[in-house]
């Protein structure tokens, strides 16, 4: 979810963008290594929306391009969707000054979305579907081997809870996947990065952020509600969002209810393994005590 940047007024010196970028680069490098997102000779198409996340992603990949032990290309691509008032000169000017290869595509999907979306319904699903199709096609045309999107930690967790709350499915947003058309590999290098870190970096870099007239004009989006919930959790219990994210990497199918993931029907007693079904859960002491305090179970 692209959050608007709120200018801050301070008497202190402006933060050094390089210092703010360093931890983001480390986390992105970790994610790339963990999921083998970028390999030798890749041509990475970075989808640049004009929001803080994709600007940050482009900066990080350009930085890694100079430092990484492998060679890969970066191509920035923006899709002008015909939104009224869209500043057509901002991104070409910015990308030219940056010296990065870039393509600006023009397709009036805005009119299609406004025409096809019933009153009171959100435009996100149709808009993203149309946008994906155009970007996938362009990736094939330029020979891109990877398509990089700017989704960060909060985007992944919002999707997890959206699917749980409204779709009754345990499903998040993968860091790497095969695209809908089966011909592209999509990667999310910012998967480990907190949105707050991106906001601080984007403010320090003073990116020319372009708001989305479709997304930003829709009140009461369920994703916004879920995002506020996560923000509240992290504010009251720092580290909780990282723990939730880590839990997605440490799944125990035998302790869930999905019969497709675990063969409960064929389960039999295996004395050598023992029965841990009724054993106490094992948590790190700090998290365990904090959880007990929160649940008022220390009585």
Curated annotation (Swiss-Prot):
Keywords, comma-separated and alphabetical: 4Fe-4S, ATP-binding, Cytoplasm, Iron, Iron-sulfur, Magnesium, Metal-binding, Nucleotide-binding, RNA-binding, Transferase, tRNA processing, tRNA-binding
Pfam families: ATP_bind_3
CDD domains, sorted: TtcA-like
Reactions performed catalytically: cytidine(32) in tRNA + S-sulfanyl-L-cysteinyl-[cysteine desulfurase] + AH2 + ATP = 2-thiocytidine(32) in tRNA + L-cysteinyl-[cysteine desulfurase] + A + AMP + diphosphate + H(+)
Biological process according to GO: tRNA thio-modification
Molecular function GO terms recorded: 4 iron, 4 sulfur cluster binding; ATP binding; magnesium ion binding; sulfurtransferase activity; tRNA binding
Residue numbers covered by motif PP-loop motif: 49-54
Cross-referenced Gene3D superfamilies: HUPs (3.40.50.620)
UniProt cofactor note: Binds 1 [4Fe-4S] cluster per subunit. The cluster is chelated by three Cys residues, the fourth Fe has a free coordination site that may bind a sulfur atom transferred from the persulfide of IscS.
EC number: 2.8.1.-
Location within or outside the cell: Cytoplasm
Swiss-Prot/TrEMBL cofactor(s): Mg(2+); [4Fe-4S] cluster
Entry function: Catalyzes the ATP-dependent 2-thiolation of cytidine in position 32 of tRNA, to form 2-thiocytidine (s(2)C32). The sulfur atoms are provided by the cysteine/cysteine desulfurase (IscS) system.
Family, per entry: Belongs to the TtcA family.
PANTHER family noted in UniProt: AMINOTRAN_5 DOMAIN-CONTAINING PROTEIN, SULFURTRANSFERASE-RELATED
Remaining remarks: The thiolation reaction likely consists of two steps: a first activation step by ATP to form an adenylated intermediate of the target base of tRNA, and a second nucleophilic substitution step of the sulfur (S) atom supplied by the hydrosulfide attached to the Fe-S cluster.
Record text on subunit structure and interactions: Homodimer.
Protein name: tRNA-cytidine(32) 2-sulfurtransferase
Organism for this UniProt entry: Deinococcus radiodurans (strain ATCC 13939 / DSM 20539 / JCM 16871 / CCUG 27074 / LMG 4051 / NBRC 15346 / NCIMB 9279 / VKM B-1422 / R1)
Encoding gene per record: ttcA
């Amino acid at each position: 979810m692209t959050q608007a940047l709120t200018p801050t007024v301070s008497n202190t010196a402006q933060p050094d963008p390089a210092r703010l970028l360093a931890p983001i680069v480390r986390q992105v490098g970790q994610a790339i290594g963990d999921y083998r997102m970028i390999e030798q000779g890749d041509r990475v198409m970075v989808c640049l929306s004009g929001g803080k996340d994709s600007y940050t992603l482009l900066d990080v990949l350009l930085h890694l391009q100079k430092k990484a032990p492998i060679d890969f290309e970066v191509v920035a691509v923006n899709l002008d969707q015909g939104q009224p008032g869209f500043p057509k000169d901002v991104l070409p000017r910015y990308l030219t000054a940056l010296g990065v290869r870039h393509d600006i595509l023009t397709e009036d999907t805005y009119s299609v979305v406004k025409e096809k979306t019933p009153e009171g319904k959100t435009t996100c699903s149709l808009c993203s579907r149309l946008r994906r199709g155009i970007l996938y096609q362009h990736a094939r045309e330029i020979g891109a081997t990877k398509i990089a999107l700017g989704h960060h930690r909060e985007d992944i967790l919002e999707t997890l809870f959206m699917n749980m709350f409204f779709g009754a499915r345990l499903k998040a947003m993968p860091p790497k996947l095969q695209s809908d058309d089966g011909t592209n590999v999509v990667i999310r290098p910012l998967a480990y990065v907190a949105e707050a870190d991106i906001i601080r970096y984007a403010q320090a870099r003073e990116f020319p952020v372009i708001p989305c007239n479709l997304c930003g004009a829709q009140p009461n989006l369920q994703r916004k509600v879920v995002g506020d919930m996560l923000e509240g959790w992290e504010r009251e219990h720092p580290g909780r969002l990282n723990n939730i994210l880590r839990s997605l990497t440490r799944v125990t199918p035998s302790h869930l209810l999905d019969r497709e993931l675990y063969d409960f029907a064929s389960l039999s007693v295996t004395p050598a393994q023992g029965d841990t079904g009724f054993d106490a859960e094992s948590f790190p002491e700090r998290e365990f005590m904090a959880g007990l305090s929160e649940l008022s179970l220390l009585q």
